[in-house]
Design a protein with these regions (language model features):
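Extended, solvent-exposed segments with strong compositional bias
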Residues: 110-133
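Sec/Tat signal peptide C-region and signal peptidase I cleavage site
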Residues: 14-18
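A glycine-anchored, Pro-Gly-centered beta-turn/N-cap motif
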Residues: 134, 140, 144-148
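Generic structural detector for well-ordered beta-strands
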Residues: 127, 137-139, 159-161
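Short beta-strand/loop motifs in extracellular/secreted proteins, especially
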Residues: 92-95, 126, 147
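C-terminal partner/receptor-binding element of secreted or periplasmic proteins
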Residues: 130-131, 147-148, 152-163
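Primarily secretory-pathway and cell-envelope proteins
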Residues: 19-110, 155-165
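Sec-dependent N-terminal signal peptides
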Residues: 3-13
Length: 165
C-alpha cells in the first residue's frame, strides 16, 4: 500500500514538473502582457495602441470615464478557447475590459465621476496565479466571447481580439 501511494505521488509530481517544463520561459519585458499560445508553446507579445481618455469634469450628475481607440479591431487575434491565458511580469494588477465597437472605433468605460468623487469600473473578473519565477498569468473567470478586448497595465492599454470557433 505504501509503495502504491509513493508511486502515485511520484507520478503526480513528475507530471506537474513536465507540464511546467513544457511552458515557455517567462517574458523578459516588465509591464507587457503576452498571450500564451499553448499549442505552439510560445509567448506572443500583445500590441499597445494609442488611445484617448475621456475624463469629464465632475458636476452635479455622474459621468462615465471612457477610453477610445481608433479602428474597429485589434491586429492581434486569438482563437476562442475555454481558457485564454496571458503572462506578464509586473507589480501592477492588470484589468481586463471588453470594448464596445461603434463603426471604426472601440470604447470601454473605466470609471464614474461625480461631485462626490470617482468610482472605478473594475472590468471583467480575472484570476491571477504564478506562472514561472517572477511572472504571473491571468485569465478571465469565464470564457471570452468573440469580440475586442483590452488589458490595462498601469497607464498602458494592450489590445487583442477573440475570433469565433
Amino acid at each position: 500500500m505504501k509503495i502504491a501511494l509513493f508511486i502515485a505521488a511520484f507520478i503526480g509530481v513528475a507530471s506537474l514538473l513536465a507540464q511546467d517544463a513544457a511552458l515557455p520561459a517567462p517574458p523578459d519585458t516588465v509591464g507587457v502582457p503576452y498571450y500564451l499560445d499553448s499549442a505552439a508553446s510560445q509567448l506572443k507579445k500583445l500590441p499597445t495602441e494609442p488611445y484617448k481618455k475621456h475624463d469629464p469634469v465632475p458636476g452635479v450628475i455622474t459621468v462615465t470615464q471612457t477610453v477610445n481607440i481608433k479602428g474597429s479591431a485589434s491586429a492581434f487575434r486569438v482563437p476562442a478557447e475555454n481558457k485564454i491565458v496571458f503572462v506578464y511580469d509586473a507589480t501592477t494588477m492588470p484589468r481586463l475590459y471588453k470594448f464596445t465597437v461603434n463603426g471604426s472605433n472601440r470604447k470601454f468605460s473605466y470609471g464614474k465621476v461625480s461631485v462626490r468623487g470617482s468610482t472605478p469600473i473594475e472590468g471583467l473578473p480575472i484570476s491571477v496565479s504564478r506562472y514561472k519565477d517572477t511572472a504571473y498569468q491571468i485569465s478571465a473567470d469565464q470564457p471570452l466571447a468573440p469580440g475586442e478586448y483590452a488589458i490595462v497595465l498601469a497607464d498602458r492599454i494592450f489590445t487583442f481580439g477573440v475570433d469565433g470557433k
